[in-house]
């Protein structure tokens, strides 16, 4: 553990990252790759909490824009995050990594209800904990869930695992060839520069609790381990103002 910079982490995995190139659904090969990457960090003794998005299956905001009641649409999105979490649990356990899924909406037949003290105990015992169901409340994103769970379990960092994006840029590098990649930012920089890394609620929660973020490309093998060891491969967003 002496070479590890972050000993307890929240890994935020977008739903799109689990879909791979298809863009929708769950790609078993992506799950297998991600599970192997997580296992390599788990083998180093790092305590790992994971928050999955659900955008590969459903987005509450999209449903609301199509005329659905927003709360109902958001609940559907929460269920999508749980499906992703169960898929990732299966991938991890196939590699021998002890894993627990905790959901903010009770469904005891398939997962534990979220209990903070129990989650921390799982981490201390070397189990990976996957947090499903978002915050359990509509109108809150899974980015906010990641910030909330990070604060609750006293995580050292939130790792924002992006699908093919290796950091935060001043503009979309696919559109603007002059886009500048930032190596380090503050939470206030995100707001003042209007950089869409996470929503304002999640950003404020991270800033208020002094939790740093690292935005990096999860598709490149070894990147999760590199970030945990402190290598500068993405963009670090300092937790303070």
From Swiss-Prot:
It is found in: Cytoplasm. GO terms for biological process: 'de novo' CTP biosynthetic process; UDP biosynthetic process. CDD domains: AAK_UMPK-PyrH-Ec. ATP binds at residues 12-15, 55, 59, 163, 169, 172. Its EC number is 2.7.4.22. GO terms for cellular component: cytoplasm. The keyword Cytoplasm applies. It catalyses: UMP + ATP = UDP + ADP. Residues 20-25 are annotated as: Involved in allosteric activation by GTP. GO terms for molecular function: ATP binding; UMP kinase activity. Keywords: Allosteric enzyme, ATP-binding, Cytoplasm, Kinase, Nucleotide-binding, Pyrimidine biosynthesis, Transferase. UMP binds at residues 54, 74, 135-142. Belongs to the UMP kinase family. Catalyzes the reversible phosphorylation of UMP to UDP. Homohexamer. NCBIfam families: pyrH_bact (TIGR02075). This is Uridylate kinase.
């Amino acid at each position: 553990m002496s070479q590890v910079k972050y000993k307890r982490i929240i890994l935020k995995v977008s739903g799109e990252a689990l879909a791979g190139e298809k863009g929708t659904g769950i790609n078993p090969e992506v799950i297998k790759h991600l599970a192997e990457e997580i296992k390599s960090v788990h083998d180093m003794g790092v305590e790992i909490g994971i928050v999955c998005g659900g955008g590969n299956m459903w987005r509450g905001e999209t449903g609301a824009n199509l005329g659905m009641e927003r709360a109902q649409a958001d609940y559907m999105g929460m269920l999508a995050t749980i499906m992703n979490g169960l898929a990732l649990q299966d991938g991890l356990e196939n590699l021998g990594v002890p894993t627990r899924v905790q959901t903010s909406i009770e469904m005891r037949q398939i997962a534990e209800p979220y209990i903070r003290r129990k989650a921390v105990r799982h981490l201390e015992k070397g189990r990976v904990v996957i947090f499903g169901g978002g915050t359990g409340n509509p109108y809150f994103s899974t980015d906010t869930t990641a910030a909330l769970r990070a604060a609750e379990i006293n995580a050292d960092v939130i790792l924002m695992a992006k699908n093919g994006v290796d950091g935060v840029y001043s503009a979309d590098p696919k559109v603007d060839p002059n886009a500048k990649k930032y190596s380090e930012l503050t939470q206030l920089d995100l707001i003042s520069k209007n950089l869409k890394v996470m929503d304002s609620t999640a950003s404020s929660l991270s800033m208020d609790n002094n939790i740093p973020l690292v935005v990096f490309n999860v598709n490149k093998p070894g990147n999760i381990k590199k970030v945990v060891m402190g290598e500068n491969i993405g963009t670090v967003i300092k937790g303070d103002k």
